[in-house]
Amino acid sequence: MIWVWPATGRGPGWWGIRRDPWGPEDSSCPCPRLPLSPTGPVGHSGPMGQCHPPVPSYRRGRRDQKDPPLRRQTSPPLPPHPWDRPLPWVPWIPLDLCRHGDPRHPWDPGAQSGYPRVREVRGVPADRPLRPCPRQGPRTAATRKESSCRIPS
């Protein structure tokens, strides 16, 4: 038998060849012998295996085989989260049509004062001024005092 192994220190690509130290009839080898087959080493024989590791051979046709298809997820899909559902349309900005101003801009001083706005507020034409809320009534000095934030002493 001939052993082939990569030799170190001899440069790239140099392979060393040497003969089997034990002849086929030599009984000093502790490992059991396999009958020689034309395809090379066939596998391990006995519990201890061979004396030398078998040379890994390239299996033909392996490169042409495709990988097995990945397993699909078998668990059922989760139910949709309630937050993912589309909500019914609601006006996100509360429309206070009793105030004379755009409720989307509460910092607008015109919305706080009593004079009518000139531009339209969400579909209400500008030439028709909005009326004040009937429950509020006109602002007087008495109602201004009641609505002040001072703590009575």
From Swiss-Prot:
Protein name listed in UniProt: Uncharacterized protein 035L
Ranges for region Disordered: 24-87, 101-153
Biased composition annotated in UniProt, kind: Low complexity: 27-37
Organism from which the protein derives: Frog virus 3 (isolate Goorha) (FV-3)
Bias (Basic and acidic residues): 143-153
